[in-house]
Amino acid sequence: MTWFIDRRLNGKNKSMVNRQRFLRRYKAQIKQSISEAINKRSVTDVDSGESVSIPTEDISEPMFHQGRGGLRHRVHPGNDHFVQNDRIERPQGGGGGSGSGQGQASQDGEGQDEFVFQISKDEYLDLLFEDLALPNLKQNQQRQLTEYKTHRAGYTANGVPANISVVRSLQNSLARRTAMTAGKRRELHALEEHLAIISNSEPAQLLEEERLRKEIAELRAKIERVPFIDTFDLRYKNYEKRPDPSSQAVMFCLMDVSGSMDQSTKDMAKRFYILLYLFLSRTYKNVEVVYIRHHTQAKEVDEHEFFYSQETGGTIVSSALKLMDEVVKERYNPAQWNIYAAQASDGDNWADDSPLCHEILAKKILPVVRYYSYIEITRRAHQTLWREYEHLQSTFDNFAMQHIRDQDDIYPVFRELFHKQNATAKD
């Protein structure tokens, strides 16, 4: 009998293959749950794991069961109401719910709650940013932006059952058994030859023959005790993420912090920028980020001040665009950098300044950037800034604009702006 002993160091992940299969099978339902859950999180907690719930009917398996129709013959215990051959009225189907606490209370029926399970931070972020990429990424001369791709990387002694290499494991098993039994097999071969000689000799040497047979049996038993396969033989296909170099890139984040931006609007803008930051840091290695806050004046700030500063004032959007243009000219040569920008505002701007914003974007910024996205966060009617930007959208293919009304719009708008296109064009 062969015994398999699990000595793997990662024994706690023995069901990982089942988990991965489950995530692949119900990816659509999981992504839907994630898109709903992200809007309920705090601004500082968008990159942790998540409890995902899936409606029971979405994970129910096909099964055979007895139908409710037709005639059936059954034997029931005796009672005071029925006698032999009486027909029993068919019970009405229960009006049960399907769990999850929806609908009115009822005295009948039964159901099941939604299936809830926990996904890790890595699984959460992988699903969150799946199929997203920086648009129009160009291969420039200096390659510092690194995107990671999964490649085969030989074999490893540890892994999940789904990645086991049967051929390599059996090769190791054969080599181990050959090495461990080579000496015994040579000794066995010599004893068998000696036994053959003695068996054919005259007179018979019964005692010597019996001794040889006993030694041969012991050697064969020792050889058979060497296990056919051992945990040391197992080899798994190894995969690793290797850097896939492409062009260097910079992302400009322009946020309106004027007095018209109330705290709720600022929080939605911060949620969008945190998603953008996580997406860039998760997908690419060397993307630089330039943070610009503006009211009547624009200022380049660090990450902490961008998200937490309380400074506010009036509204002149062109101040941020002028500062961005200055920074590009000073530090980011468009011939060597892929330049991106994401601007968030409530659309409230000094009326005479909106045409100036149109002019700066059309003549200075859009000709040198790979992609510029504008997000307007408001429930009011659009004002002059939106209307000026609409003219840009019809003229420039690398300009996109979206409208966010409440938190539920943030993630769909983000995916719409950065969904993967034929984005890695090589000019």
Curated annotation (Swiss-Prot):
Residues 79-110 are annotated as: Disordered. Residues 79-90 have a biased composition (Basic and acidic residues). Pfam families: DUF444. Residues 92-102 have a biased composition (Gly residues). InterPro entries: UPF0229 (IPR006698). Belongs to the UPF0229 family. This is UPF0229 protein YeaH. The gene is yeaH.
